[in-house]
């Protein structure tokens, strides 16, 4: 509702393909990514499906909330591979790369 501070899942699934119908929307064959397949969020307003929005506590610090999406990218990427005990290379030290270094450590990468 108006005034809520929300975070959004940036992968918009179709809800109609075989994967979505089986409850496996994470592999939806028709996924649209905000900022890639649709306009991004560097705007005063953005339209996002309600099912992709999560209401945050009014007490939450917006600075902390601002890292949810890039941190999610780092976690998703590192969690996609069996990196425990292995050497990991992160190319690029922007926000996601820097978070990826720490996520790799949390996943027990060798170095």
Which residues does each predicted region cover?
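Mid-domain Rossmann-like dinucleotide-binding core that forms the NAD(H)/NADP(H) cofactor-binding site
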Residues: 60-111
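A structural motif shared across PLP-dependent enzymes of the aminotransferase-like
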Residues: 18-19, 37-49
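Local cysteine-cluster metal-coordination motifs and their immediate loop/turn environment
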Residues: 12-30
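Short cysteine/histidine-rich zinc-coordinating motifs and their immediately flanking basic loops
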Residues: 28-33, 40
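Short Fe-S-cluster ligation motifs
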Residues: 44-64
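Glycine-rich beta-strand-centered segment in the early N-terminal region that forms part
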Residues: 1-18, 57-60
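Signature of N-terminal electron-transfer/Fe-S-associated modules in redox systems
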Residues: 1-7, 26, 43-46
């Amino acid at each position: 509702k108006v005034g809520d501070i929300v975070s959004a899942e940036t992968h918009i699934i179709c809800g109609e393909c075989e994967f979505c119908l089986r409850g496996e929307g994470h592999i939806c064959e028709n996924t649209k990514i905000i900022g890639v397949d649709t306009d991004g969020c560097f705007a005063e307003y953005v339209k996002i499906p309600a099912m992709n929005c999560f209401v945050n506590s009014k007490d939450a610090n917006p600075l902390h909330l601002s890292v949810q999406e890039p941190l999610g990218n780092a976690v998703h990427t590192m969690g996609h591979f069996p990196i425990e005990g292995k050497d990991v290379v992160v190319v690029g030290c922007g926000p996601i790369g820097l978070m990826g270094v720490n996520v790799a450590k949390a996943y027990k990468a060798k170095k």
